[in-house]
Amino acid sequence: MPFPTIPPIAGVEIATGRAGFYKHEREDLLLMRFAEGTSAAGVFTRHGVGSAPVDWCKRQLAATGGADVRALVVNAGCANSFTGKPGADAVRRVATAVGKRFDCRQRDVMMASTGVIGVILDDSKITARLPEVESRLKADAWAEAGRAIMTTDTFPKGAYATAVIDGHEVKIAGIAKGSGMIAPDMATMLAFVATDAAIAPAALQTLVSLYTRTTFNCVTVDGDRSTNDTLLLFATGQSGAPKIHRAGDKRLADFREKLEGVLLDLALQLVKDGEGATKFVKITVNGAESPASARKIARTIAESPLVKTAFAGEDANWGRIVMAVGRADEPVAREKISVKFGDLYAARDGLISAEYDEAKMSAYVKNQAFEVSVDVGVGRGSATVWTCDLTKQYVAINGDYRS
């Protein structure tokens, strides 16, 4: 999938380098420097074994209110999760080193890590490369940044849009990584978005929390939630547009729409790059008791190994979908349930459809991308989740991950 053309974002400088967290030669370190006065907001994993960098970011954003964040450091190859005090100390030392170089407080430095869980971060690999990486900071290195944070990803993921705030054009750009262990709750894998708009931290936090629910929280690859899920949004205020203090400000209408679009673009790229994936599937549930109920049913379908292996085998096995609907433990009206593949009814009013055509169903699911919709017949709640299939290649990738 081609990486989009992303122009410089005023107030953002980017550089990458090789810290040596991988046995083979590749760039695995990302450094971003932000202009003074940059606002930041984030959402993070609610995993019970959150990583040291997640703890650090949450603590610093709470302490500063997201005001004047100056830097972001990201490493790939070591998650620094389940590493106790040594892992936390490693993050602090990196933040201190970056703070000294950028003449800012350590609390103004955000950090994220991805890779193998249980290995303590060797922070000396990062601090030793800081002078070299800092010397290469430039405004147009978004593609390099996307590649540096990859783990099992097969392509770098980026998105870009422009919006208008009170007559001023502003830019929004982002990168993300993730291919497996994707079933986010409050965030997803790693994603970093920057804008040159001027938005107060509290408003920025409201926006990122709101649109995470409709984007990153609606995708799944394998049902496993990561220990390191992090989404950070930075606003440099360098566009010349007036500063916005409320998320509901009418002047933000276009920006809100474009921000949600960038986040959804990144989230869907994660699914399309799901480990071993050959299918991209949109699952919509209608007629549920509430949107939350619909979302739970849709996620249960999307994460069912039996459903996902049927997708891989290009088998329109609608019985497995009905099984997953019932397993969600949400209110449904059995005698009203319908299942469609695209426009083709597999089941209707609780029975196999009179229009059911096995040949047409089989032909439809041979497409690389297709849609499944379910109506559970109890209310007006609806939700959409995007997923992929589960293939032998997924097993091979994860079986060989450390070896």
UniProtKB/Swiss-Prot annotation:
Key word Acyltransferase present: yes
GO terms, biological process:
L-arginine biosynthetic process; ornithine biosynthetic process
The role this protein plays is:
Catalyzes two activities which are involved in the cyclic version of arginine biosynthesis: the synthesis of N-acetylglutamate from glutamate and acetyl-CoA as the acetyl donor, and of ornithine by transacetylation between N(2)-acetylornithine and glutamate.
- The entry's substrate-binding residues are T151, K177, T188, E275, N398, S403
Assembly, per entry: Heterotetramer of two alpha and two beta chains.
| Protein name per UniProt | Arginine biosynthesis bifunctional protein ArgJ
The species is Caulobacter vibrioides (strain ATCC 19089 / CIP 103742 / CB 15) (Caulobacter crescentus)
- Signal peptide segment: none
Q: So where's the catalytic machinery, residue-wise? A: T188
Write out the entry's keywords from A to Z.
Answer: Acyltransferase, Amino-acid biosynthesis, Arginine biosynthesis, Autocatalytic cleavage, Cytoplasm, Multifunctional enzyme, Transferase
Report the GO terms under cellular component: cytoplasm
Q: What is its EC number?
A: 2.3.1.35, 2.3.1.1
The record ties this protein, via HAMAP family, to: ArgJ
**Which chain regions cross the lipid bilayer?**
none
* Family, as annotated: Belongs to the ArgJ family.
Pathway membership of this protein?
Amino-acid biosynthesis; L-arginine biosynthesis; L-ornithine and N-acetyl-L-glutamate from L-glutamate and N(2)-acetyl-L-ornithine (cyclic): step 1/1; Amino-acid biosynthesis; L-arginine biosynthesis; N(2)-acetyl-L-ornithine from L-glutamate: step 1/4
